[in-house]
Curated annotation (Swiss-Prot):
The gene is hslO. GO terms for molecular function: protein folding chaperone; unfolded protein binding. Its main location: cytoplasm. Disulfide bonds join 247-249, 280-283. InterPro entries: Heat_shock_Hsp33, Heat_shock_Hsp33_C, Heat_shock_Hsp33_N. It comes from the Bacteria. The keyword Nucleotide-binding does not apply. This is 33 kDa chaperonin. One of its GO terms (biological process) is protein refolding. Gene3D superfamilies: Hsp33 domain (3.55.30.10), HSP33 redox switch-like (3.90.1280.10). It comes from Prochlorococcus marinus (strain MIT 9211). It is found in: Cytoplasm. Transmembrane segments: none annotated.
Amino acid sequence: MNDTLVRATAANGGIRLVAAITTNALKEAKSRHKLSYLTSALMGRAMSASLLLASSMKVLHGRVTLKIQSDGPIKGLTVDACRDGSVRGFLGNPSLELDLVKSKEGHHCFDFANATGKGYLHVIRDIGEGDPYSSTVELVGGGIGEDIASYLLHSEQTPSAVFVGEKIKHKELVCSGGLIAQILPKASQDRSLAELLEENCNTITSFSERLFEYKDNLSGLLKDLFYNLNPEIVKGPSARQEIKYRCKCSRDRSISALKLLGNSEIKSILNEDKKAEITCEFCKNVYQIEEEELRSLVDI
């Protein structure tokens, strides 16, 4: 099944719900970047979270960028997601693998805290005009979900529950995705609604398992998890959004990037290598710029 994002409301429009499946996008990222199990999980969570955030943007070309800058061995993570469902990302140390740790419930899980270490999550929202809106929060746990919830609370003053997860079965990635539940401004003063939503979210103890169970039926997932809040899928074309791992790089953009180096640096490349090779960080596509093209970029 294709990766999909589904939008819904609950509690008579007082709560916004969005769920996403990103399994295929993560498999594409895993293949392109040669990700380990640990970094696959982190990448999948970051892609899911960024798509959930981008889903609320009013313009189709709106973009959300998540960046983790920290002292952990993952050596940084960057993910771009657009309102149109496209997503891409890269990590500083894609082959990183750490021993599993035990959760509070006694389950073995990935050691996200030590992978990311101490640092910050940067969230950049860009609608394509004016200056992008940027906000930074300290990492809470490194597993992405808590970190995004912290960002939404402190930077956007929006109480939110964020769930992200993945399922690996027989050493194969079989499911990745996420869910966000937010109380909308018109219901923000309703304490009973906030308490009811919190109660619901506290019962979700194994999101990855529930996601795997409903991976082909996100509507069913929302109706199951929030059954007492009467969730309703949004009507119209905005109800569902296809998700794809898609990069915006191109040969022309690579040449434009070379121009920024300036005449002196390009001449140095010509003298030493006669050509340039540019690799896109996001998708690993390689662009070969031959000598004749390089010479056309400078005044010799």
